[in-house]
Amino acid sequence: MSSTSTSNTAGITYPKAYDVVVIGGGHAGTEAALAAARMGAQTLLLTHNIETLGQMSCNPAIGGIGKSHLVREIDALGGAMALATDKAGIQFRVLNSRKGAAVRATRAQADRILYKAAIRHTLENQPNLDLFQQGADDILVENGKACAVVTATGIIFRTKTVVLTSGTFLGGVIHIGLDNSKGGRAGDQPSIKLAERLRELKLPVGRLKTGTPARIDARTVDFSVMQTQPGDTPLPVMSFMGNVDMHPEQVNCFITHTNEKTHDIIRKHLDRSPLFSGTIEGVGPRYCPSIEDKIHRFADKNSHQIFIEPEGLTTHELYPNGISTSLPFDVQLEFIRTMAGLENAHITRPGYAIEYDYFNPQNLKPTLETKSIDSLYFAGQINGTTGYEEAGVQGLLAGVNAALSTQDNPVMDSWTPRRDQAYLGVLVDDLITHGTKEPYRMFTSRAEYRLLLREDNADQRLTEIGRKLGLVDDTRWQAYQQKMESMATESARLKDLWATPHNELGKKFTEQTGEVLSKEATAYDLLKRPNVGFNDIAAVTGAQVAADVGEQIEISVKYAGYIDRQQEDIDQMKRLENTQLPADFDYKAVSGLSNEIVQKLNDIRPATLAQASRISGVTPAAIQLLGMTLKKQKKAKAALDI
């Protein structure tokens, strides 16, 4: 990869120079392009096919455990995913609704066509953003810095920064049984030349694998023998700016199960599986395994739940969630027809596995800029993640930092949230600190400060930052300010209302909740009781605030003690986060560090003491030594400056 690449550079140079060129129009690419353009950067989104912008390549769903938290963070920063989901969602459910607020998660089944249309509409109406249909074959580099992108026909787009969001297209190989073919996904050509160019970088390249199930014609399915899975009532929304009126028609999903016959057929044909024959070298997602992998790994289970999900309102295609497979087509047809309701199923598209290139994310800066090439940013599956939501949030961050690097921003020259600020911060820190050898998926369990990182308060955590960055428009900002003002006003009102065992408010409270007061308390403090919700307090005090405002007040009251304790831990960690480690820090010169620790620190080059403390094998004693060394260096420098 250099400025001396051969045939491609013989083409024309496009007359307009850009601040940011984004390669790839998937979930990472669209959020990257929109973020950069919202910040005022002249941005180009380069895609091999404009018709597939925002395409849901696998399951037609957004959100879920840990994932909806990321979607809400994208939304709080002005991104497109949540609003597109509200416009396309054909079933909404809140998962873990009976558990604590930290792990509750909204999941939406989406109409593929409506979702793609919503994303494309947003892209086409975004100022400062141009679209261009053509694949990228090369990234030109001068003096160690990305400076242009060359398309398949040799068109050169000059740019200050490049954001690469290639998904599964880099060196993509599709597997169905023992047959394989080159492809970025079914029906799309892979990016071969760009993959070859990228391998010239001094970055460790790996191979990962993902897969998708067969699609089924709903007209050949007997839903009467399946369990019906309806959406929630009242309907949830995904975006802070969304509302129920945006939602299209709502539909049911269904549940069936595999059985011993299903498993016997799959076991019988494992020798024809590329996963078990050794044809596939890439590691697949641990938390979304293929059906053949599930049956092999969980041999003691005689049944697995399969969710039958509609792909949209205007199509008969169904997505059978839980039977991703790369077995031959004849085996797919045979095992699918063993399940209740699918005995006569017609497959419209076979399932397949896809193997693709990714790059070790430990070679990225916290901004998602590569350490090897300046002004080149990676986002999405190229960094070893899996999932639309993980891709989208990385794309937004890469787009933000690419834009910032081209601007003289008085507020900040780069931005990456801390682990206590956002799941995005957790994701990036995990990737750049630990790397990954398998597709990385977000879970709430990955966040040590998850009481603070709830999906319901993503706007309180990030919208003000988004406003400073230029990501949040006036409409969203005004809505956020009104919400915060409403929360403050209502909280103050409740603190001024006193209930006693004998006054009218106290009697109403007991009648509403069945709880007897033994002493006086404010309406605000009554929310601390486990069995009392904001709706109860609203009923007896005449509160008239939006549902999300009431929810926020209730959560803040009930979790106040836990949050305060967690905040103490965060304050301690912030001291380490604020201690920068120079990029050229000489770890060998620190007396007392073991060779193993020196090697790990040299390999990862942590940006802060906090990041260093999270590297496996780096001890608290080592962190103390590093801190002492930095203090000595700071004192020595101060003495020289006198």
Swiss-Prot record:
One GO BP annotation of this record: tRNA methylation
The domain of life for this entry's organism is Bacteria
Q: Which cofactor does it need?
A: FAD
Q: Report the SUPFAM superfamilies cross-referenced here.
A: FAD/NAD(P)-binding domain
Q: Which UniProt keywords apply?
A: Cytoplasm, FAD, Flavoprotein, NAD, tRNA processing
Where on this chain does FAD bind? G24, G25, G26, H27, A28, G29
Identify the main location.
cytoplasm
Question: Where, subcellularly, is it found?
Answer: Cytoplasm
- Name the InterPro entries on file: FAD/NAD-bd_sf (IPR036188), GIDA_C_N (IPR049312), MnmG (IPR004416), MnmG-rel (IPR002218), MnmG-rel_CS (IPR020595), MnmG_C (IPR026904), MnmG_C_subdom (IPR047001), MnmG_C_subdom_sf (IPR044920)
Can you provide one Gene Ontology molecular function annotated for this UniProt record? flavin adenine dinucleotide binding
One GO CC annotation, please? cytosol
Residues noted as binding NAD(+) in the record, renumbered to the chain: 284-298
Self-association and partners: Homodimer. Heterotetramer of two MnmE and two MnmG subunits.
- What function does the entry list? NAD-binding protein involved in the addition of a carboxymethylaminomethyl (cmnm) group at the wobble position (U34) of certain tRNAs, forming tRNA-cmnm(5)s(2)U34.
Family, similarity comment: Belongs to the MnmG family.
> By what name is this protein known?
tRNA uridine 5-carboxymethylaminomethyl modification enzyme MnmG
This protein's encoding gene: mnmG
